[in-house]
Amino acid sequence: MPKMKTKKSAAKRFRIRAGGSIKRSQAFKRHILTKKTTKNKRQLRGMTVVHASDVASVRAMLPYA
């Protein structure tokens, strides 16, 4: 059986936490920022957890994580 390949695009976007949950960075922070409020941009800075319905597909992309 050959080695499974990690999807490199997913490896750059997701990190597995110690408890097993997956964290990701927020979207909507790259451009068109003038119309967004300061509060909105500040809240987009942090990381968030991947939704439960998406965890299985992310784990399939990261077999060795």
From Swiss-Prot:
Ribosomal protein keyword on record: yes
Q: Where is the signal peptide?
A: none
Any one Gene Ontology MF annotation carried by this entry is: structural constituent of ribosome
A Pfam family per the record: Ribosomal_L35p
**UniProt keyword Oxidoreductase, yes or no:** no
Task: Provide one Gene Ontology biological process annotation.
Answer: translation
Alphabetized, the UniProt keywords read:
Ribonucleoprotein, Ribosomal protein
| InterPro entries in alphabetical order | Ribosomal_bL35, Ribosomal_bL35-like, Ribosomal_bL35_CS, Ribosomal_bL35_sf
What GO cellular component is one of the record's annotations? cytosolic large ribosomal subunit
Q: Which family does it belong to?
A: Belongs to the bacterial ribosomal protein bL35 family.
HAMAP family the UniProt entry points to: Ribosomal_bL35 (MF_00514)
What is the name of the protein in this document?
Answer: Large ribosomal subunit protein bL35
Q: Which organism is it from?
A: Nitrosomonas eutropha (strain DSM 101675 / C91 / Nm57)
| Name of encoding gene | rpmI
